[in-house]
Every structure is written in C-alpha cells, then in structure tokens.
From Swiss-Prot:
Entry-linked PANTHER family: INOSINE-5'-MONOPHOSPHATE DEHYDROGENASE (PTHR11911:SF111), INOSINE-5-MONOPHOSPHATE DEHYDROGENASE RELATED (PTHR11911)
Stated name of the protein: Inosine-5'-monophosphate dehydrogenase
Native organism: Haemophilus influenzae (strain ATCC 51907 / DSM 11121 / KW20 / Rd)
Disulfide bonds listed in the record: none
Biological process, per Gene Ontology: GMP biosynthetic process; GTP biosynthetic process
Chain's gene name: guaB
Length: 488
C-alpha cells in the first residue's frame, strides 16, 4: 500500500550544526541581513504580529536594537495606522511633517494636544504654512490663564533658531549649544516650515547606533493585514501612515485568496516591500514569489501556542520547511523568514543555517516589559498573558480571517491556537543581547563571518533522541537559572 509519503522531515531538535575551522571571533561576526531587497536589518530578528507581542512599545525597542516589529491587526484601521505613525515619529533625523498649531489656538486646546500627542513643542504657522513662532513647555509652564492664545506666549519669529534644508549635523548641534535650545526649525528660503530637529533624536541616535532606520533617519516598522475582503482600506491607511513593510498574513499562504491579495497589493504599490505567508513547501514559496512577495514567511504550526498541526493534521517540521523554501527561492534573491518554534538562540542559528535570512519570534518576546498586557502574579511569580492568533480570544477580536473563518459566529469558531501565560522576562534589549550573543558564538564555532555565510556554508548532522538528551542539561538540578536557558 502506497501512503504517498513525500519525504522525511526534520525540526530544530533533530539536527545540530557542525563546528568548523574558524578565524571568526564572536564579537567580530556581522549580524546584518536582508529582510527584503530594499530593507536591511542589523540583527536577524522580527517580532510576530500578535496581539500579546507587538504594539508601539515593542516595535520601537526592537527597531532601536536593529530588528523590525510587525504591528498586529486585531484593532481598528485607524488605531493600527496610529501605532505605525507613533513608531515612525518616535525618532526622526528630521521630523519632516511636524505637528503645527495656529496662532489663535488657546492654551487649553494646546494642553489637550500635548496630552494626546505626548510632546509639548509645536511650530506655530499661519494659514500659508509660513513660520511665525514656536511654542514649547517652557513658554506655557507657569501660565495660569488658559484662555490666552498661542500667539500671546509663543517664542516670536525674530527669536527663532532656524536652519536651511540640508544643514550638517555639526552645524545644527552648534546652533543648539549656542542658543541653549532643544529644537531647531528647518525652513526654506521663503521661511516656510519644512521640518523640525530635536536634540532628543540626536541623543537617541547616539545611544542606539545599531537601530534599523529608513533613509530619513526614522525607525522602521511593519504591520500585518489579512487577505480577506475589506483589507484594501487597511492597506491604504498603513501605507499613508508610512509603514516600511507590509505583512500579508495567513495561516495558509499557498491559498488563492492570499495570492490574489498579494497580486492586487503589488499592482497598486509596485515599490512597497511585501512579506507574505505562511507556507511550508517549495511550491508555496514559489507561488508567493510569483504573486509579487518581496519575502516569504515559512511556518505552518511550529509556534508554542499553535495547535494547527494537531487540529488539522497538517504541517511540515520547521527545518525542512525552511530548507525547501530557501532552496526554491535561492535564484530569485527573495529572502525566507523562519516563523515559529524558536526556543533558544541555537534555534535561531539552525533556522538561518537551513536557509532563512531572519527569524520571527513570538513567545521569546512575549512576557517582556514592552509587550502588551499587564503583569499578573501567580503563585509568587510574575507572568504576562500570551495567546495564539488562532486562539478563541484572538479570533473573536478580529484575527479569524487569518484562519479563513471570518464569517463564523463566535460560538462556531474552530480554534488553531491556545491562550496561556508566560513568565515575565524584563526588558527586550536583555533578551536580544542573549539571543544575539548565542548566534555570534555559533558563527565563531562554525567559522561564518556573516549571516550569508551561515546560510550557505554551515553543515548539519542529524541526531537521535539520545543526542538531544545529551545536548540539554542532564543529571543535575539547576539551582540558578541562566538568562538564555529556561526549560519548560
């Protein structure tokens, strides 16, 4: 009897990388990699578009460390676009379209704006966008009468510190120091406002030199959309908000609806970087590439909170899925993203060695300070909630179209994920430091100086159950947990 078995498939715990002659020291390894042809990451890490993983705070922190976060779509269109805008505005070389105020605005109205936007400095312009002043926290701090207008208390035009477009960093910093100001306004020859530069952005850039930024010095951010009807409006809003890369996200990327959504989006936005997924075969990867995807995301059911393989009986173990997709796309230069199943830094190294250009993680970043959600105490330990986008709770909030169930009533949803909790882990930068440290050590051991070399040069051995048992801590009780090794 023929069972139509296609091949034997392997996952992370089935293989190990082989050490090789090396001239590479871990601290000299180069971790930069391509997300798409246009976007280069400084570390090969992306955060999953999940509602317990990525919103503004985590996307900002990850971009500052050199990766990119994908804002989840379990929210209204306006809210998701607003999250993207917040990341883009958090750190700018030049704030190209600063929020401005008119001179007749009252201080009470200004106070509302400050509360809403989270910053207190606004250029003051007339109806023609001519710069006439600036108002900052210093101007308003001790004013009691909130019925006064901006024009009565602002710093007037003749006292402004301005620069022309294209001024050098040194010139700007010298001006800031000379005039003891924290904001410099950028104007053209006819004194029309063109932008604003703040000292905070210079400080942030110095503190985080590895940050993943666009050509204007703004942090990069991605956002997820579904493939179902009604997502056109969401895509348009995200593009308008300045999203760097769009993720067309589905549990089954090798589906005609997803392919059609990729084709339509590519036709409308020919230069927009588009990541599409998820697939687990060479054929699926090729289909998405043919439809116009800039990068392909691989992983059907490997995630810790995912039950797709058990509920549906469908999936491909992750190392084989990555290797097949990467081999199929090798000649096209389209990167593969390994999504799911990553528990240790060694798994990141194995995913890249199998052919992935970068990895997307959920559970590794869930539970961090920056992840959405409150810290809960349970039996004396701190936890944060973590759930699959295929869990009942997430599907009821809007992710059901990812699993082709958008028309189902809440009590008729068939979940492909669970809701759980994960130990509180502290700040994201500490997690990234440990994970990238492990990856650097791997590159030293295998003699690979770059991510590209690791993708193409490193060799695997297949191991048995006894081999994985030997690899883990054994025959000893752990008395002090290591920051990069947690079992269970």
């Amino acid at each position: 009897m023929s069972l139509r078995i296609k091949q034997e498939a392997l996952t992370f715990d089935d293989v190990l990388l082989v050490p090789a002659h090396s001239t590479v020291l871990p601290n000299t390894a180069n971790l930069s990699t391509q997300l798409t042809k246009e976007i280069r990451l400084n570390i090969p890490m992306l955060s999953a578009a999940m509602d317990t993983v990525t919103e503004t705070k985590l996307a900002i922190s990850l971009a500052q460390e050199g990766g990119i976060g994908f804002i989840h779509k379990n929210m209204t269109i306006e809210r998701q676009a607003d999250r993207v805008r917040k990341v883009k505005k958090f750190e700018s070389g030049i704030v190209s379209e600063p929020v401005t105020v008119l001179p007749n605005l009252t201080l009470a109205e200004l106070a509302e704006m400050v509360k809403k936007n989270g910053f207190a400095g606004y250029p003051v312009v007339d109806g023609e966008n001519n710069l006439i002043g600036i108002i900052t926290g210093r101007d308003t701090r001790f004013v009691k009468d909130l019925s006064k207008t901006v024009s009565q208390v602002m710093t007037k035009k003749e006292d402004l510190v301005t620069v022309k477009e294209g001024a050098s960093r040194e010139e700007i910093l010298e001006l800031m120091h000379q005039h003891r100001v924290e904001k410099v306004l950028v104007v053209n020859d006819s004194f029309k406002l063109k932008g604003m530069i703040t000292v905070k952005d210079f400080q942030k850039a110095e503190q985080k030199p590895n940050a993943c930024k666009d050509e204007f010095g703004r942090l990069r951010v991605g956002a997820a959309v579904g493939a179902g009807a009604g997502n056109e409006e969401r895509i348009d809003a995200l593009v308008k908000a300045g999203v760097d890369v769009l993720l067309i996200d589905s549990s089954h990327g090798h589906s005609e609806g997803v392919l059609q959504r990729v084709r339509e989006t590519r036709a409308k936005y020919p230069n927009l970087p588009i990541v599409a997924g998820n697939v687990a075969t060479a054929e699926g990867a090729i289909a998405l590439a043919d439809a116009g995807a800039s990068a392909v995301k691989v992983g059907i059911g490997p995630g810790s909170i995912c039950t797709t393989r058990i509920v549906t009986g469908v999936g491909v173990p992750q190392i084989t899925a990555i290797a097949d997709a990467a081999a199929a796309l090798k000649d096209r230069g389209i990167p593969v993203i390994a999504d799911g199943g990553i528990r240790f830094s060694g798994d990141i190294a194995k995913a890249i060695a199998a052919g992935a250009s970068c990895v997307m993680v959920g559970s590794m970043f869930a539970g961090t300070e920056e992840a959405p959600g409150e810290i809960e105490l349970y039996q004396g330990r701190a936890f944060k909630s973590y759930r699959g986008m295929g869990s009942l709770g997430a599907m009821a909030k809007g992710s059901s179209d990812r699993y082709f169930q958008s028309d189902n009533a809440a009590d008729k949803l068939v979940p492909e994920g669970i809701e759980g909790r994960i130990p509180y882990k502290g700040y994201l930068k500490e997690i990234i430091h440990q994970q990238m440290g492990g990856l650097r050590s791997c590159m030293g051991l295998t003699g690979c100086a770059t991510i590209d070399e690791l993708r193409t040069k490193a060799e695997f051995v297949r191991i048995s159950g006894a081999g994985i048992k030997e690899s883990h801590v054994h025959d000893v009780a752990i008395t002090k947990e290591a920051p990069n090794y947690r079992m269970g």
